[in-house]
Amino acid sequence: MSSTEMKSYLSLIPISAKVRRRQNRMTILCIVLAVFLVTAVFSMADMAIRMETSNQLNKNGNWHIMVKDISPETAAELAAQEDVAVFSAYSDINASLTENYFAGDKRAALVGADDAILQIFPGMQCSTAPADGEVLVTANIRDWLDVTVGTAIPLTLPDGQTISLTVAGFNEDTSDANQYDAVVLVMNRSTFSQIAAQVEESFETQYFIQFKPRTNLRQSIVNIENKYGISEEKISENTYLMALNASSNNDYIAGLYAVAAVLAGMVVLAGIFMITGSINSNVAQRTSYYGMLRCLGAGKNQVRMLVRLEALFWCKTAVPAGCLLGIVSTWGLCSFLRRFIGEEFSSLPVLGISPVGIICGSALGLITVWFAASSPARRAAKASPITAATGNAVENAADSPCHARLFGSRAELSLGVSHATSSKKNLLLMTGSFALSILLFLSFSVLLRWVGFALNPLQSYAPDLSVAETSGQNVLDPVLVEQLEALPEVKHAFGRMYCPLPAEYQGKQGPIDLISYDTIQFGWAKKDLIGGTLPQEPEDGTYPVLTVFDKSNSLTVGDTIQLEDAKLTVVGVLNDSPFSSTDSPIVICTEETFHQLTGQNRYAVIDIQLKDTTADAAIAKIHTLLSDTLNKQVVFSNRIEGNRMIQSTYWAFHLVVYAFLIVIAGITILNIVNSISMSVSARMKQYGILRAIGMDDAQLKRMISAEAGTYAVSGLVVGIALGLVLNRKLYILLITHYFGAAWQVPWGCLAVIVVVVLAAVVLAVYNPVRRILMQPITATISEL
């Protein structure tokens, strides 16, 4: 065969595509959807990374590591390192806001830093670094003082002295300052040292390091440790920024990387299965066409190349369309999140183009189509010239003995199962498509659970406002809780007592953190129990208590804790609590038990939940009441904005995940509908013969339903079996190890999966059956 003839065969590709436009429509749609899915997922991930990078730079600063406990000489050498872009010393006073530093009447934290701090924290708006006697102040100071650049503000020191500082600029990141109803003053190190010396306040100096772009962050950190003998304990990482650069050595972040890689891989596999199955079905129903080409003299290699290039010809329109659809959907989702969800999405790019998403989507389409066409191409090349006369070759559809025994006299059911299982590859592709969709559903359902555990403001006990005495001692009068509860704006007010106690447990001695709960807090804690029960009345001189799961806390139900003159028994374990984890086990008891053990009956902290978190007047009223009652010796925390942002993030996350799962479910349904439709088209003559020899409409429906049902059942069995294993592993990795909650079979998810699969079967059967029944039997017979 000459090269000229080969070219003439390949010239049939655009002609065939034009003639078979309707038949190829579903295959092209599958490619479009697969490319769209991957493009949208990776583009959205890229946009989210850009947003989080911007947010973290503004909130936590543009630094990679912070080093402490080093000499000035070592600090100077670090600043001169080739891979270091920005280096700044940093010291603070009253970061805990427990000392009496006031700017006006608001508590103040003081920061002393080098000029380079402006490069570390982009939110600081100042043309030049503060000079002696000047400060950068958090912008929330403008809420109660008429302050502009150049205005002098008074700073009251703990010894009662007042000094005047000039405002040189503002720090627009006020989230932490607003939460604690305070301001942060940033000054140069000379001014800072003078103030510290004046009040005889000691401080520690730390050093922020920002590495140059395209630096191997992990290697640079290791080099610093080795060269200067700095231990890991002296180096703190900016975890979020390092994670966004895929450079974090945090075990939990590394686990999230692995989870993301697995889920991304399954998304890609879902697209591969869909494209491969569609091309395989398309080629199967055109066997007679390839047989005709063999009659005209085409060789096997020519037919093989024809099939591959024909598949790539579909990509000419399908890949750009899929990428465009993915980009537009990303724009729409970003615009929705930015406009309607919350301020935390304000830095999300609305019309951003993601090269990563486009490259991944295009590569998936082209590479998958090329390799997916390989097997059908070999199959088409095997078509003998006689196929052109006998029609499309269909795998042996004869009923196997096992099918006959299974369905007895129901020959149509046996035939349907045989049609599904006669092509092992097609069965594998359909089963894989179903199974992957189920795997994705069960995997992403774990992420939804993880968000609920990870975000504390979503919990029932999350306060809107909190107040604690500056010393952190139990000095808040319980009467104050009653006064707050009596306010019409307050939904709940509740307090907690706290006391560290020496104890002996599990054969070792060590401190415990004893904390009290009232009735309403125990009610909330009930749903967080992962073992045991809530504490009841003391028995035999033993006080029942709860503990909180933590990897460093080995206490479990039944353990006893011996105090100096009392014994506690752990009767329950919680997976979560409002408290930050410490090296000491958290032990929770009733207020009465706390009083009997410590003799104290006042609170260390009072939390407040409001009926309307948007009522600024109510918040101001409560703030005034607390400040007047406690003579301003309190740390007042306003968590409303932070809670609102996290709740918005929670719902946005759910929205994105559910939208993704809906797309996956839709693609799965489309895939089986397409495959059943193509299978019916390939066997159209066979169905005509069956109708001619007496098969009625009901039997025909049952036969095609049996074929679709076989795909569904095999997909359900494989998908649920593998999905439950993966669901359990992800749950243990993300939740059990960190929150203590035990894995349980997700019956709700399984029920949804079964319903979706049954819906796919019903939709897959409807159109092919209607098409067959509309075709006259004589039309089929006349073609034989």
What does each model-identified segment do?
Residues 96-152, 164-175, 192, 199, ...:
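Short beta-strand boundary microenvironments
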Residues 307-324, 397-403, 704-718:
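Selective transmembrane-helix segments that form parts of the transport pathway or gating/packing helices
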Residues 1-26, 285-302, 329-359, 367-452, ...:
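Feature of multi-pass inner-membrane transport and sensor proteins
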Residues 201-202, 210-258, 620-651:
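A cross-kingdom feature of multi-pass membrane systems that activates on extracytoplasmic/periplasmic
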Residues 30-106, 443-511:
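Hydrophobic, regular-secondary-structure patches
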Residues 20, 271-315, 668-710:
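Interfacial "coupling" helices/loops that link adjacent transmembrane helices in transporter permeases
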Residues 250-267, 356, 647-664:
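N-terminal membrane-entry
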Residues 48, 252, 323-360, 646-653, ...:
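Short helix-loop junctions at transmembrane helix boundaries
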